[in-house]
Amino acid sequence: MKANGQSLSSIVLALICFSCYLPPVYLFTDARLLPKWYLCVAILAATGMFAAVARLRGKPLPDGRGVMTSFCKMFTTVTVMECLWVVVCIVKDGLRPVGEVGTLGNPAELALHLCIAIPIAVMLAMGNRKRKWLALYGAAAILFVAVLLLTQSRTGLICLALDGIIGLCLLAHRLVRRKGLRCVLYGVLALALLAGTLLYVASHKTASTSGRAFILQRSWELAAEHPLIGHGHRGFEREYMLRQADFFREHPGSEYAMLADEIHHPLNEFVHVWVNYGIVAPLLLFLLLVLPLWRWRRGDRRMRPFLLPVFAILVFSCFSYPFYYPIAWLTVGAAALCALRSVLRRWQKHAASSYILPLFFFLVLGAAVVDAVQEHRWHRAYRHSFRDVAALEEYEELHSYFKRNPAFLYSYAMASFKRGDLDRAARLIEECGQHWNGYNRELLAGDICSYREEYPDAIVHYEAACAMCPVRFAPLEGLYKVYDLTGDEERRNAIARQIADKDIKVYSSAIWQIKEMCK
């Protein structure tokens, strides 16, 4: 029975690790991210439900430390498989100019997984006395570092440098006995490695770095408007692009105009939650991420495996959006559960918890299944929306479920517009604006108003889209057509000259067609 329990535990842990690297599943609107979340949440909820029922029946559960060790081994194994797949892709198709992604959505996501896996592999190697396993885990760590460099992720490189500094300092602590010399050596090693890394990061992809700085400046302005309570749920998505448009109206010749794009996240988790929920949110997030270090400093040695993986998530939180991915929640959640295990044990002694936990996990599992089914229906409606009138009926059935989802409302509005139902499209795009304001929304709103012959409103929306992303040509094309339809030759010719003189950021056939049309 014990062997069967261990086998089942290993299978569950392997599935959880596999869910983090799940390849695209083209059954949902987001083929890369949503399947990972559904599989991960379903496995965790089902496991939690069965574990809670087993505890209620008095059956023993696996030891937490053993489960953690097994998870580390499984995660290292699955990450090795991912890296080997990256190698296969390189051999087959060559190096990607923008960095390797493997089965994941972008290089930063792969870099995050590797930055979590590297310290785990090193820990397993250092904690194993058998030379065979020491060599295997050491080789895995080297493979992870090599693939991390191939992702070209600057945040991953910073994280790797900081891990290297910590490792060198620990090595110096063991080899150098004199405290004064040890401190000098710490400082020299840290400064040399960190300075070299930051110099490379600053000189690499300078346009992207400038764009990030611009986004953070506008985001700080939003946070400063409501520092205590924030702008509310989805506040960043509602307010940021409006703030970006205001900036370019005031600074039409700004150097950032060529860099501006549709933005959904400030590339900083702390700023993101601050804009949405106020100053308390980033403070709580920071405390959650430093909780393992605090517990370890208080003498809790069980927190040691979590220190560098959670530190990697902390670094990525400053430059990216790691909490979009299941691996960040798994790592931080496991660390928090381990840190608060004494509190949880006391709570588990209450009889009510024995019945609440199975019900809670059952509800989570049910919610995940329902959401997956509805997302699949949305994906099916989207695929058929351009050739099947019945797809709009399915959109309407889904509206009550997704009525607060701006991506669904935009998709439904676009489908209605393409099918010629302009009144419904106008209602939906207005409803979408309650949750999200962005370039694509303004552009579609302009097209809808233009087809409804509401030309003044169309001009307002096209001008808003122009201000949000000055580098784009589509809003100017919309303005040109509106002025042509209304017979305003002076403004039409002014827009034509603007299109002719406008610099092109990314060349495409669509842009050349616009330029030819407006000659």
Where do the protein language model's features map onto the residues?
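Alpha-solenoid helical repeat scaffolds
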Residues: 407-411, 440-445, 473-478, 508-513
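Interfacial juxtamembrane loops and adjacent helix segments
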Residues: 233-275
